[in-house]
Amino acid sequence: MSKVFKFGGASIKNAKAITNLKNIVFSYKESLIIIVSAIDKTTNELEGVWRSFIKKDSNDAIKKANESIKFHKSIIEELGLNSDYEFFSFFKKLTQELLLFLSAGPKENDDLSYSKIVSFGELFSTLIISTYLKKEGLKNEWIDARTLIKTSNQFLESKVNWEATNNEINRTIDQNITYVSQGFIGANQMGETTTLGREGSDFTAAIFAWCLGSNEVIIWKDVDGLLNADPKYFNNTKVLKSISYKEAIELSYLGASVIHQNTIKPLENKNIPLSIRSFINTNNSGSSVREIVESKEKITSLIYKPNQVLLSISTRDYSFIFEEHISEIFSIFSKIGLKVHLMQNSALSFSVCGIISNKSLLILVAELQKNYIVKYNDKVNLLTIRNFKNLDIPKSLKDQEILIQQRSRATIRYVLK
């Protein structure tokens, strides 16, 4: 049973980083499934290409795409892959496919265009890494994840068709061979490119592991493991050496950014351990997520999500908020794209804290105001304290006003402004 490795964009940000990836892979003597994200910041750059494209500015979209292609070519040259004719022909074919798509102008479905354009980040990175590993002596096969990961027809945050995906992966993958494939992307029944959501490469690794019955998934990160808080916002962070699947699901649901929230469930279903390791400090054992008996003495975790929006919604006639109101409200959230992170309701109002783009927020408020009174605060911050020992807000956030406070047995949450 193979191990599944996942390398994120920061771990392959330049030629030196890709050489480090090679050293990690070479230290394992077994066959591997290697899932790779787009090279650092490439997804953001290709999102810029997409924004120009849907504004019908094909010239700017092509200009930005060529800048990204030029960057990838510089890495190719530094890794010494220029003389590999087969590789360069394939890479050129991919770049031409992207540029031709952009030249043809916007399609009717912007989400389809997004998935198509952004997917080239993963296609470029995996082709480079697969070829480089071959050059250095590791036999492997590059495989297009879109031929294996079968999804629903929605192009963004597409749902996995587990039966079809399981059939394709087990029909195609020989567990005696090392493969390099893409995170984040799949395809629908029509063969159109779909995406699993930002940071979805972790989920891709879990999909492969579930289908193959792998003995471990290792996610290689730029931190020493799963931390109890984001060091960007909090001092004296600690590595959670070993936690249960249940606790990992709770943390990812509450917003912990190290693990994609869909990753844990398929691993738990087949009792496949997950390790979060540092690609910098490779001797560090990192964090382990597995089926364990949880200790009564738990480490407090702090999850801070900035730039949220707080919406308070009430009926126009001051009638109670009932289930049918909430059902209608959530239907609007789903249609316009609000990701809800916290909910609270009283007799006359329903409040949610979540994340949405500024443009979509205005559309959302206008839609809700057709039937409801709506008040909102933008740029609020959501703090979640898991396994809290007291009710104190960390000193670094003391100057913020508390708009909402929620408390359960193990978790306390604040919406702050």
Residue ranges and their predicted role:
Residues 2-3, 31-34, 73, 140-141, ...:
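Structural motif
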Residues 285-417:
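A conserved regulatory-domain signal marking ACT and ACT-like small-molecule sensing domains
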Residues 9-10, 39-40, 185-186, 201, ...:
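Short, glycine-/Ser/Thr-/acidic-enriched flexible segments
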Residues 1-256, 264:
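Nucleotide/pyrophosphate-binding catalytic subdomain
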Residues 136, 270, 336:
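Conserved dinucleotide-binding and phosphotransfer motif residues
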Residues 53, 255, 271, 372-375:
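Conserved NTP-handling cores and scaffolds of large molecular machines
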Residues 242-290, 295-297:
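A conserved active-site cap/scaffold subdomain adjacent to cofactor or substrate pockets
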